Design a protein with these regions (language model features):
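ABC ATPase NBD coupling module
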Residues: 43-59, 80
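Conserved ABC ATPase "signature" region
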Residues: 84-102, 150-153
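Conserved ABC ATPase signature
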Residues: 105-109, 113
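Hydrophobic anchor residue at the start of the ABC signature
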Residues: 119
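A short, proline-enriched helix->beta-strand linker immediately N-terminal to the Walker B motif
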Residues: 124-128
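Catalytic Walker B motif of ABC-type/P-loop ATPase nucleotide-binding domains
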Residues: 130-134
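Conserved H-loop
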Residues: 159-165
Length: 183
């Protein structure tokens, strides 16, 4: 998958879509046997621990920490050596239409707002590649379209190679890349 490209993986439940993502991200359960290589920027990342792979993940649920503010959630994901974190957070929130949400409790966010914060958290962690696991499936049709457009636009603009797992043909069509089906 090239920079800014989105590969879509579709298939019925139990076909191995989520297992594929777990393998790439480095958290496949030891009960599973796997082999092969995963190249990111020309480097095989399979021997690296999950936290060293620099893979960004976006799931069905935003998975925001309830005990941290919106800014705290974003700061948590940023590399330790990142400079000007507060400014990056403020600029990022402004960029996704959530200016001034820094101190908000994540529990007070709507589904769309929480999805936007989860996307920004992913981008601020400075990944080398991104995995999307049904990230729009819990949103209503209109909100799903809006968030899908935002996510795909931001990932393309960031030139991040992305793999999307979905059951939704609208997701695959809007991703605009190659579609692979697992059986």
């Amino acid at each position: 998958v090239g920079p800014g490209e989105i590969l879509t993986v579709m298939g019925p439940s139990g076909s191995g879509k989520s297992s594929l993502l777990a393998y790439i991200a480095g958290f496949l359960a030891p009960a599973f046997e796997s082999s092969g290589s995963v190249l990111v920027n020309g480097d095989d990342i399979c021997s690296l621990a999950a936290e060293r792979r620099r893979i960004g993940l976006l799931f069905q649920d935003p998975l925001l920490f309830p005990h941290l503010s919106v800014a705290g959630n974003l700061r948590f994901a940023m590399p330790r050596n990142a400079q000007h974190k507060s400014q990056a957070i403020s600029d990022g929130l402004n960029d996704i239409g959530l200016a001034g949400f820094d101190n908000r409790d994540p529990g007070t966010l709507s589904g769309g707002q929480a999805s936007r914060v989860a996307l920004l958290r992913l981008l601020l962690c400075a990944p080398n590649a991104v995995l999307l696991d049904e990230p729009f499936s819990k949103l209503d049709t209109q909100l799903s379209e809006e968030i899908r457009t935002l996510v795909f636009d931001k990932l393309r603009a960031s030139e991040l190679p992305t793999i999307l797992v979905t059951h939704d043909k609208a997701d695959a069509e809007q991703a605009g890349g190659e579609i692979r089906t697992l059986l």
